[in-house]
Amino acid sequence: MSASAVFILDVKGKPLISRNYKGDVPMTEIDHFMPLLMQREEEGVLAPLLSHGRVHFLWIKHSNLYLVATTLKNANASLVYSFLYKTVEVFCEYFKELEEESIRDNFVIVYDLLDELMDFGFPQTTDSKILQEYITQQGNKLETGKSRVPPTVTNAVSWRSEGIKYKKNEVFIDVIESVNLLVNANGSVLLSEIVGTIKLKVFLSGMPELRLGLNDRVLFELTGRSKNKSVELEDVKFHQCVRLSRFDNDRTISFIPPDGDFELMSYRLSTQVKPLIWIESVIEKFSHSRVEIMVKAKGQFKKQSVANGVEISVPVPSDADSPRFKTSVGSAKYVPEKNVVIWSIKSFPGGKEYLMRAHFGLPSVETEEVEGRPPIGVKFEIPYFTVSGIQVRYMKIIEKSGYQALPWVRYITQSGDYQLRTS
């Protein structure tokens, strides 16, 4: 997840500035970067990530400079690239134009900025307004030590101000998972993934430190100790308040939170999910006469759970008219501007099976049908339930005044892009 070192190279690949953050990659490895880049250019397969043995180079180009991060691990590439672009943005605010000459003329400031921007390979202070409060440019010299260190730095957080007070200290935690599903007309699952977020609503006084623990199914997989019944999270992204260095060491999610609402983390699971609401449909079209539609919906989740606000959208021909419906539960309505029937079920318990029949008339002169038929779409929300099994095991709230705070946890599984194709 972290970068080992960061280099700034000139147009010929010669290092102008380098900062070794972790010491696990020899600094001489950068000598392989430019030959690899030129080789890829000749082959016409240029990529933003190059590899030499076990070392990976993640790079961007700005003006006549290359910014390169090296790593040995399976790093969070999006985080590293975001850091490189943010570094360019910060340098441009300091030097107006970022090019070889501005790096050479201000190398002292560049080194100081690199020390503040990243710590042990993890992005740290990337807010240019905070950096400019205590790393100031006067000519080519760095002015330090005279002015007081700004409050945002002593607090080590730019996202939370001091002096926040609440009569009642509470934290609300929402674990929300969206299920993306695509099933073909034969009933085979083509795409199945879970996109999850953990959102917090924080009403806490002072400058508290929070520690969030997830259940062992998650932690064991992340630390490589589990072999089965585990949840392998992909594309894990944290809010900037999370201490990434600690998470990298022991998987503890430790942070000083912003005040109010924010997204603590997001993740993705590319795993075969059993469709929570399974749809079987028969659509029969009788030429110049009518369309008969039969849709069967089954809840394939635990019986003690209930899906709320279920909406099943069934496509119908654009020239259909005179709709008639019969449902075993809920209600159906025709939405002609979208060419769909929407079957609404307020409460859908797990293990239950329901039926909807629809009858439409067709004109005697048929309109030309567009190739392919839109899929059936399903919307739903299941409270107190996560598909992955992720759970919040504990939330510790530590604040110097020692007040007691109440954490509240809510779990929600909902439909994302949930589609089933029809034949």
Curated annotation (Swiss-Prot):
Post-translational modification: Phosphorylation of membrane-bound AP1M1/AP1M2 increases its affinity for sorting signals.
Membrane topology note: Peripheral membrane protein
Keywords: Cytoplasmic vesicle, Golgi apparatus, Membrane, Phosphoprotein, Protein transport, Transport
Keyword check for Acetylation: no
One Pfam family from the record: Adap_comp_sub
One GO CC term on file: AP-1 adaptor complex
Subcellular location: Golgi apparatus; Cytoplasmic vesicle, Clathrin-coated vesicle membrane
Domain MHD: 168-421
One record GO biological process: intracellular protein transport
Function (record text): Subunit of clathrin-associated adaptor protein complex 1 that plays a role in protein sorting in the trans-Golgi network (TGN) and endosomes. The AP complexes mediate the recruitment of clathrin to membranes and the recognition of sorting signals within the cytosolic tails of transmembrane cargo molecules.
Entry's family note: Belongs to the adaptor complexes medium subunit family.
Complex formation: Adaptor protein complex 1 (AP-1) is a heterotetramer composed of two large adaptins (gamma-type subunit AP1G1 and beta-type subunit AP1B1), a medium adaptin (mu-type subunit AP1M1 or AP1M2) and a small adaptin (sigma-type subunit AP1S1 or AP1S2 or AP1S3). Interacts with P2X4.
Protein name: AP-1 complex subunit mu-2
Biological classification of the source: Eukaryota, Metazoa, Chordata, Craniata, Vertebrata
Gene that encodes it: Ap1m2
